[in-house]
């Protein structure tokens, strides 16, 4: 089984992949378009988490394909579902994923449900303000942003929006 990671699964997959490789998923973009009321915010003060959002243009989301040992596949899938489907804001999708070495593998990933109440479309500056202040059950929203932006840089995956947000949030949290 393969898993496509584009956010926290990059730096905290929750399992030990037996193989990992850069992968680019066409038709989606990485976006802070989901309100987080559990992991990185609360119902009273929601944070924002990344989701795959269907792209209206020819966008591609760059991330990692993480291969799960088949003996662990069912357990890992149950754990992923418990983590990612904590609310119904994500929808599980099995996608045809092009890997960097030319292979194509069927992979599970999690896509935002645009009809869900947690779906949102804020500008970058408003996203930064939310991320700078929100804290949830798994820690601060800024930690989530910084770890994801750092991992993308380490992997050589450019994401100008996350870089902008990381700088903006760092400035906001310094002045707080």
Which functions belong to the PLM regions below?
Residues 1-176:
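A glycine-rich, hydrophobic/aromatic-adjacent loop/helix-cap motif
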């Amino acid at each position: 089984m393969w898993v496509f990671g584009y956010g926290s699964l990059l730096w905290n997959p929750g399992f030990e992949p037996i193989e990992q490789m850069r992968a680019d998923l066409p038709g989606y973009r990485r976006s802070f378009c989901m309100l987080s009321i559990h992991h990185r915010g609360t119902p009273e003060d929601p944070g924002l988490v990344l989701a795959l959002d269907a792209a209206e243009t020819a966008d591609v989301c760059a991330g990692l394909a993480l291969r799960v040992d088949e003996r662990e596949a069912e357990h890992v899938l149950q754990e992923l579902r418990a983590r990612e489907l904590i609310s119904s804001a994500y929808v599980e999708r099995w996608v045809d994923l092009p890997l960097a070495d030319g292979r194509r593998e069927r992979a599970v990933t999690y896509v935002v449900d645009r009809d869900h109440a947690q779906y949102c479309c804020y500008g970058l500056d408003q996203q930064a303000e939310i991320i700078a202040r929100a804290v949830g059950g798994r820690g601060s929203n800024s930690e989530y942003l910084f770890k994801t932006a750092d991992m993308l840089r380490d992997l050589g995956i450019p994401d100008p929006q996350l870089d902008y947000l990381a700088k903006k949030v760092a400035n906001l949290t310094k002045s707080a």
